[in-house]
């Protein structure tokens, strides 16, 4: 899988470098540099074709649109992953707290119901296979 990305990365780096060189030629264009300009434009077209070939290998990869927003804002796209993980961790802690609270509530409820309805709770515990209330 990484090989696909490495291949795409190589093509993109070459493409960006070609655009940089093309910008230099265009910014100081001389009629004598027309041949070099044509050559760079041909390299540019071939680079786009190479990138398009990579697209076929990566058709099953999806990127969240928010990642592109990060890039457009000049932020590191890896921050998106970090922030997603932090949000997931916070949500997991919140859910764990709710689960712990419900377990405590169940334990207290069973204790109190055992005091008020000892026979019924004994039957309940027998059906559930519990000898004693969970802690």
Curated annotation (Swiss-Prot):
Keyword Transcription in annotation: yes
A molecular function GO annotation: transcription coregulator activity
Superkingdom of the source species: Eukaryota
Main location, first listed in the record: nucleus
GO CC annotation terms, alphabetical: mediator complex
Pfam family, one: Med10
Alphabetized InterPro entries for the sequence: Mediator_Med10 (IPR019145)
Subcellular localization, as worded in the UniProt entry: Nucleus
Keyword annotations of the record: Activator, Nucleus, Transcription, Transcription regulation
Keyword Metal-binding appears in the UniProt entry: no
Biological process, per Gene Ontology: regulation of transcription by RNA polymerase II
Described function: Component of the Mediator complex, a coactivator involved in the regulated transcription of nearly all RNA polymerase II-dependent genes. Mediator functions as a bridge to convey information from gene-specific regulatory proteins to the basal RNA polymerase II transcription machinery. Mediator is recruited to promoters by direct interactions with regulatory proteins and serves as a scaffold for the assembly of a functional preinitiation complex with RNA polymerase II and the general transcription factors.
Stated family: Belongs to the Mediator complex subunit 10 family.
Assembly mode: Component of the Mediator complex.
Name of this protein: Mediator of RNA polymerase II transcription subunit 10
Organism: Xenopus laevis (African clawed frog)
């Amino acid at each position: 899988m990484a090989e696909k990305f490495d291949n795409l990365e190589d093509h993109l780096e070459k493409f960006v470098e070609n655009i940089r060189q093309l910008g230099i030629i265009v910014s100081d264009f001389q009629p004598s540099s027309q041949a070099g300009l044509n050559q760079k434009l041909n390299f540019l077209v071939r680079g786009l074709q190479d990138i398009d070939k990579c697209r076929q290998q990566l058709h099953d990869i999806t990127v969240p649109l928010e990642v592109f927003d990060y890039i457009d804002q000049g932020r590191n796209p890896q921050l998106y992953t970090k922030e997603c993980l932090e949000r997931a961790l916070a949500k997991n802690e919140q859910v764990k707290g709710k689960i712990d609270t419900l377990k405590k509530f169940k334990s207290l409820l069973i204790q109190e119901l055992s005091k008020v309805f000892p026979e019924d709770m004994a039957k309940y515990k027998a059906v559930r296979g519990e000898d004693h209330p969970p802690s």
